[in-house]
Regions:
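Glycine/proline-enriched, intrinsically flexible loops and inter-domain linkers
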Residues: 1-736
Length: 736
C-alpha cells in the first residue's frame, strides 16, 4: 500500500517522486528500496535541479583525459602523466559537527582522487564563516581548521593553500569546500565501472557502522531549529585507516586484477554499487550479510545507507580474487567478496538468503528526476546603488590599515600554520601567495593550484560575479607563472525550490561557462551544494572555482612577495571606477552595494599571455593580482610577504581618478609585477596591448603611495604588519 506523507518527509521525497518510483518498479517499493531512492534521488547525488544548467558548461579540451561523470577529472600534463583533481563540499556536516564534518570532507576528496589511480599530492580548501567577532563563529572556524589539519596531516597529504572569507550571510551556514590534486600515468587511470559479468564485487576498508545514515539526504535540506542536534548523521573519520587504504588500493591496482573501483562516499554502498553498475550497463548482486560491520543487528536499510568512512567498492577479475585478498591482508584491511557482477542491470540486495531490495540501476541513477525549476532573473536593488556618490573617506592611511585588518583580507597565518604544507617534499610555494605550487617529481614541471570565489559580487550580480570568480582564479594561477589547463567548481547556493535562488544559479552557471570558454579552461567536474539556508535565509550565491595550471620549468615559479630592494614595480592594466561590492564600501560604509566590476575577458586573456611570456622568460621576480582592497592593499601584501614585513617602497599611482578610487578600486585584469628587465617587459606589454605603468622601486621600511605630487599614504611597515595580523590576535585570544 502507498506510504504516508510522514515517511516521504523523513526521506525528503515528494509524492510525485514516490509515484515515479512506483512506475519505474511496476510496484510499491519496500522500506529498504525507499531508502535507496531517497539518497540516490537527493540533490547531493542526483543533481536533479542543477543538471539542465550544468550541461551547458565547457568540458572538453585538448588536455582533457577525463571530464565530468567520474570520481574526479583529469588533464594531461605531458610526459605520460595526468593531473587528477576535484573539489567537493562538506557544508552541512561541518555546521553540525565542525571537526568531523571538515575532516571527513578532506577524507572524501582524497578518496575521489586515489580511486582514479592517482596518488594525492596536495589539498586546498575554501572556507566561509560569519564574522569572527562572534564567539560561535570562532568556534566553528577552530573546529573546521582542526579537522582539516588533523585529517590531512595524519594522512600525509600537504594542505598547500586556500581561502578564508567572513561574511554575515554565512553566519548560520558555513561553507567548507575541499579540493585535492593527484598525479597518475594516463595509461593507468581507473574508472568506476562494474564491468565483466561474473566478476567479483569486493568490499574493502573499514567496517560499516550506523554513522552517516542519510548524510546525503541531510545535505539536500535546509537547516532550521534543532539542526545542530543531527550529529548522528555526521561521519567519523580515521586518517590512519585512509592512508593504509590508499596504499593497499594503489598496490592492488598494480596487480592488474582490478576492473573498476569507487569510494563509498555520499549514499555509501548504495551509490557506489548502483553507479558502477549503471556506468557499465550491468547489474550487481550484493549480500549485506558479508559486509564487515562494527555494530550488531544492522538492517539492510542501515548497511546500504551508512556513510561510514574509509571504505571502497571494487570489482576484480573472476579468478584473480586471491591476488586482491593477498594485497589487502598485507595491509591488515578487510577485503570481503560480497557479490558479483550480473547481466540483468539490476541492483539486488540480499541479507543471506532473503532478498531485501531489487531495483534497476538505471532507476536509481539515469532515470532520477531532472527538474527545470522555475527561476526569475536576478534583480538586486543593492546593485543599483551609486556607491561613487558615497562620501570619500578623508583618512586614506586609516582606510588602508582598516582594510588590512578586515578579516577577509587580514593574514590567515593562524589558519594555515595548523596545516602541514610541506609533507612529501613536493611543495614549492605554500600558503600565503597567489597560488600554491607543487613539483611533478621526475620532471622539470610544476603545477599551480588556486581556489577562488566572491559571494558578495555574485549576490549583487550572479552572472558578472561568476565571470569574475573564474577570471580571478585563473589570474592567481598565472601570477604563479602557470598556464591554466583545467578547472573544477563547487557551487554553493540556497534552496533551489525558490525561483530567486534558481535564477542566481542559472546566471552563475552561464557566467562561469562564458568565462571558461573565453579563457580556454575546460571544467572537468565539480559539485553542487544546495539548501545552504537556515530558517529561510540563504547564503550569498557562492561559486568556488578551483583552477590547475602547468609550469613547464618549476624554477620559473613565482610568489607575490617583493624580493630585493631596487627592483622596479609595474602595474599591468588600468584602474577604473570599480567600487561596487568592494571591501572599501563594506568596511568604510558598512554596505554591500553597487554594481560589481565589468570584466573584459579579452583584456584578461591578454594580461595572462603577457605575464606567462614574461615569467617563462625569467623577467619577473614576483607577481600579485589586484583584487580585494585594490592596488593599495595589493602593494601592502607584496611588501608584507607571507611571513612578515619585507621592504616597502615609494609608488606613484597613474591616472586622475579620485584618490580613494585610485587606491582601493577593485578593477579586474590587473597585476603587480617586479622586474629588473624593464625594457623587455615594456616591449612585451606593448606587443600584447596591455597597459603597463611603472610605479616605483622596492626599498625602505615605509610604504608611500602618491598620485602625482600628492602624497596619499605614508605608513611604516610595522604599522601595516600590525594591522595585517589583527585576525591572528583575535583568533589566538583565550576562549570566552
Amino acid at each position: 500500500m502507498p506510504v504516508g506523507d510522514d515517511v516521504l518527509l523523513r526521506h525528503n521525497l515528494t509524492r510525485e517522486e514516490y509515484d515515479r518510483i512506483v512506475r519505474l518498479l511496476g510496484r510499491e517499493p519496500n522500506p529498504t528500496e525507499i531508502g535507496l531512492f531517497s539518497v540516490m534521488w537527493s540533490e547531493h547525488c542526483s543533481y536533479k535541479s542543477s543538471k539542465v544548467h550544468l550541461r551547458t558548461l565547457p568540458t572538453e579540451g585538448p588536455r582533457v583525459v577525463q571530464g565530468p561523470g567520474e570520481n574526479a577529472g583529469a588533464v594531461a600534463i605531458g610526459d605520460g602523466l595526468a593531473a587528477v583533481f576535484k573539489i567537493e563540499s562538506h557544508n552541512h556536516p561541518s555546521f553540525i559537527e565542525p571537526y568531523q564534518g571538515a575532516a571527513t570532507g578532506v577524507g572524501g576528496i582524497l578518496r575521489d582522487v586515489f580511486t582514479m589511480g592517482a596518488r594525492p599530492n596536495a589539498v586546498l580548501n575554501s572556507l566561509r564563516f560569519g564574522p569572527p567577532t562572534e564567539a560561535r563563529n570562532r568556534r566553528l572556524l577552530a573546529g573546521v581548521v582542526a579537522g582539516i589539519g588533523g585529517y590531512g596531516n595524519a594522512f600525509g597529504c600537504p594542505t598547500v593553500g586556500g581561502e578564508v572569507v567572513f561574511e554575515d550571510s554565512y553566519e548560520a551556514n558555513p561553507l567548507v569546500n575541499a579540493l585535492c590534486l593527484g598525479l597518475v600515468r594516463t595509461d593507468r587511470i581507473f574508472r568506476a565501472r562494474a564491468s565483466g559479468v561474473g566478476n567479483t564485487v569486493f568490499y574493502v576498508g573499514a567496517k560499516t557502522g550506523r554513522d552517516g545514515i542519510h548524510g546525503a539526504t541531510m545535505a539536500s535540506a535546509e537547516f532550521g531549529e534543532g539542526s545542530e542536534e543531527r550529529r548522528p548523521t555526521v561521519q567519523v573519520g580515521d586518517p590512519f585507516m585512509e592512508k593504509v587504504l590508499l596504499e593497499a588500493c594503489l598496490e592492488a591496482m598494480r596487480t592488474g586484477a582490478i576492473v573498476g573501483i569507487q569510494d563509498m562516499g555520499a549514499a555509501g554502498l548504495t551509490c557506489s554499487s548502483s553507479e558502477m553498475g549503471a556506468r557499465a550497463g550491468t547489474g550487481i548482486r550484493i549480500d549485506i550479510a558479508k559486509v564487515p560491520k562494527r555494530e550488531t543487528g544492522m538492517t539492510a536499510y542501515e548497511v546500504m545507507l551508512s556513510e561510514s568512512q574509509e571504505r571502497m567498492l571494487l570489482v576484480a577479475e573472476k579468478g584473480r580474487e586471491a591476488d586482491v585478498v593477498r594485497v589487502f591482508e598485507k595491509w591488515d584491511l578487510h577485503a570481503e567478496p560480497i557479490g558479483a557482477v550480473t547481466d540483468d542491470g539490476r541492483l539486488r540486495v540480499f541479507d543471506g538468503e532473503g532478498l531485501e531490495a531489487d531495483v534497476p540501476n538505471s532507476a536509481l541513477t539515469d532515470e532520477a528526476p531532472v527538474y527545470e525549476r522555475p527561476w526569475v532573473e536576478p534583480r538586486n536593488p543593492a546593485a543599483v546603488v551609486d556607491v561613487l556618490a558615497f562620501d570619500p573617506p578623508p583618512d586614506l592611511p586609516g582606510v588602508l590599515l582598516a582594510l588590512l585588518a578586515s578579516p577577509t583580507i587580514a593574514c590567515k597565518r593562524w589558519v594555515y600554520r595548523q596545516y602541514d604544507s610541506t609533507v612529501r617534499s613536493n611543495t614549492l610555494v605554500g600558503p600565503g601567495s597567489d597560488a600554491a605550487v607543487v613539483r611533478v617529481k621526475g620532471t622539470r614541471k610544476a603545477l599551480a593550484l588556486k581556489t577562488d570565489g566572491n559571494g558578495r559580487y555574485c549576490w549583487l550580480d550572479p552572472y558578472e560575479g561568476a565571470r569574475l570568480a573564474v577570471a580571478e582564479a585563473c589570474r592567481n594561477v598565472v601570477a604563479a607563472g602557470a598556464t591554466p589547463i583545467g578547472a573544477t567548481n563547487c557551487l554553493n547556493f540556497g534552496n533551489p525550490e525558490r525561483p530567486e535562488i534558481m535564477g542566481q544559479f542559472a546566471f552563475t552557471v552561464r557566467g562561469m561557462g562564458d568565462a571558461c570558454r573565453a579563457l580556454s579552461v575546460p571544467i572537468t567536474g565539480g559539485n553542487v551544494s544546495f539548501y545552504n539556508e537556515t530558517d529561510g535565509r540563504a547564503i550569498y550565491p557562492t561559486p568556488v572555482i578551483g583552477v590547475v595550471g602547468l609550469i613547464e620549468d618549476a624554477a620559473r615559479a613565482l610568489t607575490n612577495a617583493f624580493k630585493e630592494e631596487g627592483e622596479a614595480v609595474y602595474l599591468l592594466g588600468d584602474t577604473a571606477e570599480d567600487l561596487g561590492g568592494s571591501e572599501l564600501v563594506k568596511v568604510v560604509h558598512g554596505k554591500v552595494a553597487g554594481r560589481p566590476p565589468r570584466l573584459d575577458l579579452g583584456a584578461e586573456g591578454r594580461l595572462h599571455a603577457l605575464v606567462l611570456e614574461a615569467a617563462g622568460a625569467g623577467w619577473l621576480r614576483s607577481a600579485h593580482d589586484c583584487s580585494d582592497g585594490g592596488v593599495a592593499v595589493a602593494l601592502a601584501e607584496c611588501a608584507l610577504g607571507a611571513e612578515g614585513p619585507g621592504p616597502g617602497g615609494r609608488f606613484d599611482l597613474p591616472g586622475t581618478l579620485r584618490p580613494d578610487i585610485l587606491l582601493f578600486s577593485e578593477t579586474p585584469s590587473r597585476m603587480l609585477v617586479t622586474t629588473r628587465e624593464e625594457a623587455r617587459l615594456r616591449a612585451a606589454a606593448h606587443r600584447h596591448r596591455v597597459p603597463c605603468h611603472r610605479l616605483g622601486i622596492v626599498g625602505g621600511d615605509r610604504l608611500t603611495l602618491t598620485s602625482g605630487h600628492r602624497e596619499l599614504v605614508d605608513l611604516d611597515m610595522a604599522r601595516l604588519h600590525a594591522a595585517w595580523m589583527s585576525l591572528e590576535r583575535l583568533l589566538s585570544a583565550p576562549a570566552e
